[in-house]
Amino acid sequence: MSSYSQLFAQHLDTLQHRTRDILQQQGLSGLAIHSGQTHRIFLHDQDYPFKVNPHFKAWLPVLDNPHCWLLVDGVSKPVLLFYRPVDFWHKVAELPNAFWVDFFDIRFLTRPEQIADHLPASKQEWAYLGGHLEVAELLGLGQPNPEAVLNYLHYHRAYKTPYELECLREANRIGVRGHIAAKDSFMAGASEFEINLAYMKAVGQGANDAPYGNIVAINRNAAILHYTHLSALRVSDAERYSFLIDAGVDFHGYASDITRTWAWRRGEFADLIATLDSQQQEIIEEIKPGRRYSELHLQMHHKLARLLQSVELVDMSVDEMIHTGVTNVFFPHGLGHFLGLQVHDAGGFMQDERGTHLSAPEQFPYLRCTRVMEVGQVFTIEPGLYFIDSLLEPLRQSEQGKRVNWNKVEALRPFGGIRIEDNIVLHANGVENMTRQAGL
């Protein structure tokens, strides 16, 4: 057995244990996990790109095949119902032949409705996990997406198995190749569209494979947090200021989520990037088991406030900037989030396996994680500094606006903003920065 297969075997043991535990707690017999179905575009004869149920791909890296099922009870060998229709219009999924096949009892479906022949007699005692409740009802599965089951699975998903960590490392290694290619393309004068093509070629994945839409932003577009327009217009060297790329890849169903910002030429903006990069590394060093993620976010706002002071953008004390929300204008999003099967992975607000919810602090409503940081968790650390028109204008009209250096703000607006994002594993003996270790 290869070392990779050994990691996968341990991973399945963990999933089986979690399944046994929650089934016993809830008095259920098993889980019927649906890979999903395609969705037809309204008034069209084509479907939206298929996205697999994350609960399905937690068990195996089958990412592009709808109408598949897993039947798991935490004890027996998991049953995989693999969909292989007779179809001359579309590519049919290949016969499974990978490191994971020996761990499943694999059966084949040629029509979606054949799943009914494979369900247990006690299907009323089985929970359905998936996005098509009408299918669960039609099949007679008695427990569709039970909240207690989902809460338990989402909470424990924060603790990554060694197999999952290796998948995330590989997603970072591949993603870093793309980021280097994207930087080189920007420096060669390419458009956003061309840069994105260079990124996709380097990672070997298209838009439908990506864990999220690539953010490839030149100049002011970097001030749009989720900018995915991809302009095909080239910007002249004289009007070329900055480049922000936030892009990841998928490896066996696990996402990387990496951001870098580059300056076209030396100057104040390049210095800001270097300073924020140093602060990002400092805040990563503060990650310790037992600390709450929201405390780390607040600490980052203190660092950003000192940066705003040091470059004479804002003439206020650190505490006053934070208390009045001035730092939120320049850094409006959260410091980061859990990362794994989904780019914003589940469980970020859950304080226990029952799903007890702790919302983001009122002062920082866009923070995506309030958990206590523990060994085995993976999250992003992504501080930012932006010049966003819709946030700056209310500040200009406020009392605090009198203490902002608006001449400097206007000089920096054309650069859009900065974000620097790494993917971090928390170990008992420290942190592992998967992104930096991959060479970025």
From Swiss-Prot:
The keyword Acyltransferase does not apply. Gene3D superfamilies: Creatinase/methionine aminopeptidase superfamily (3.90.230.10), Creatinase/prolidase N-terminal domain (3.40.350.10). One of its GO terms (cellular component) is cytosol. It holds the Pfam family PepQ_N. It comes from Aeromonas salmonicida (strain A449). This is Xaa-Pro dipeptidase. Keywords: Dipeptidase, Hydrolase, Manganese, Metal-binding, Metalloprotease, Protease. PROSITE patterns: PROLINE_PEPTIDASE (PS00491). The gene is pepQ.
